[in-house]
Amino acid sequence: MHKILTGGLLALLLLLGGVLPAAALDIHIDNSQALGGSLALRYLRTDGVWVTKGWVNFGPHSKQTVTLETWEPVFYLHVEVGGGASVELPGEKHRFWVVRDVFELEGDARPARGQQADFIKVEVRGDDPRFTLRF
């Protein structure tokens, strides 16, 4: 009886593993430009808290991957290049707080030295949660 229950639970876990969303979302940055830049990201962490964090720096003519620990296929993205010029990206705009230094803000925290920036909403579809940002 114990073996049947264990086997049944294992089969159920394997079945659910195929339906549950991944706990990580990869953002691939492919910058072919002569200027480097920075990203700020807002996403729902696996513990259920929205977090806005920055800055993920990328160099000129570089490629790198950022992994977000999240169950959600939706995140928000803000991009700056060349020392702070915002990049206008197409998409649904939302305003969130950022700080010039490296930061991580939970929920709707409003930092003392912060400013609001335009983020675009990105929704990733498919079984393999990844997004590629090309410049």
Regions found by a protein language model. Give the residues of each.
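Short, well-ordered beta-strand segments in beta-rich or mixed alpha/beta enzyme
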Residues: 8, 78-79
